[in-house]
Amino acid sequence: MAQEALTPQMWEALKAVKEVYRKNKTLTLISHAEGRVWANKVFFVEEDGYLYGVVERPQDGRGHHYRNIVQNPNVFFIIDRNVPDRFLQGEGQVELLGDVTERHERHILFRKVPQAVLFAKFFPLLVFRLRPTRLYISDYTEEWKPRARVEVTEEVFKAFQGPLKTRPRPWRAYWQGVRSFSFTVTLFSILLGAFLAPALSWPLLLLTLAGGLLAHASINVLSDYFDHRRGADTWLTLGSSRVLLDGLLPPGRLLLFGMVLLLLAAGVGLALTALRGLPVLYLALAGAFLGVFYTSPPVGLKYRALGDLAVFLAFGPLMALGSYYVQAEGFSPVPVLLSIPLGLLTIAILHGNNFRDIMDDSRAGFRTIASLLGFRGSGIYYLGLVVAAYGVTVVAIGVGWLPLWGLLVFLTAYLAWRNLRAAFQPRRVAFTFLDLVTAQLHFYFGLLLVAGVALGRWVG
């Protein structure tokens, strides 16, 4: 009915408006009252024609928008990508819904803009709902045409609540739950072990990668589920997939998904066992124990300050050695030694997350290495992990187990230095993202280490 009530020109303008909403995460909010004008960028998301976002509460000189909106809820806003091809200007009325700690509407924003969680963690924020009253859409992506003006009537709202409503795609929630960005940890360890073997079977390597990635995905999903059930993850948590926190999936469905992934990984493991023998099964069972009981009861290695050791073993020596065995049908100390740098940097990723969350974990009564060491000790621990990764690489080259191509990893030294500076300056913004920048270091270090082994194998 909404589509029939609108002219073709209006419908075209609304579709352009929806595209602007979809492709942007921030808007410039302009409020004014009694001669005071304030403008700044705020995170936002559109739902059913309304715009939801957060502004600062009045505290320590902050809260300019709050003071203006309380006296005058009429605002202006601009949404653009700093490129004058398609942008939106608008007028509307803002309703301050309440403190972000108390309003469930925060999850409407967090689903699309998880970066907003970071600001909610460090600044006092209020959730707002903006009802647009007039929109001006400029769309020069295909042709030069006049700016379209849209009076936001009930018919327009019905269009956003009907034909233009964003329909969540179920697969996206599952994909978000597996946290695919972390898969390079598994990828590099498996490639390293395989490339070190005397002979290489590409079909077996692909099967090993499939099993390893399925196992990694299942561990990520199950960890989210058990962290949520234990109460370790709250709406302010930065390290989880947020699938449960933001209500994208019910807990039972996520648990089922994790179990299905684990069964698929087990199927691949049994296939490799049939092809290469029982040692594959023993290594897989050891890795499965460390992964599944990382967060799940009754063990919960993560909460007994054993998470670092579990992650090191599972994603370092065990994975590389298992991959090597599948190719060589035998064991060697070489993949164990060369996987140590990758395992250490994997711990550093985890530690970066725990380091940032020391206060939260301590309040919740959870024990991690970071919470036991404190801020100063955690910085030194992080330094040791990173420096040791490079040190072991040098040792491996010195004993002849890694070709000189392995020196390529030192191209990442600048990233390591940047991260170390952040680790000893907790008040810097970079410290908040220590886990992410450490993951970046791991990616490039792992890529260059595997490339060095590959070059030594095929180039000499």
Predicted regions and their residues:
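Interfacial loop-to-transmembrane junctions
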Residues: 292, 416-446
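Acidic (Asp/Glu-rich) catalytic motifs at the cytosolic membrane interface
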Residues: 214-238, 347-370
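Intramembrane alpha-helical segments
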Residues: 241-242, 246-333
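Multi-pass membrane catalytic core of lipid/isoprenoid biosynthesis enzymes
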Residues: 236-275, 367-401, 439-445
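Membrane-embedded alpha-helical segments that form the functional core of polytopic membrane enzymes
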Residues: 192, 198-225, 281-289, 333-352
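Topogenic membrane-insertion module of multi-pass membrane proteins
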Residues: 163-207, 211, 298-299, 304
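Charged, gly/pro-rich active-site loop segments
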Residues: 2-11, 86-164
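A short mixed-secondary-structure module that forms the rim of ligand-binding clefts
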Residues: 45-84
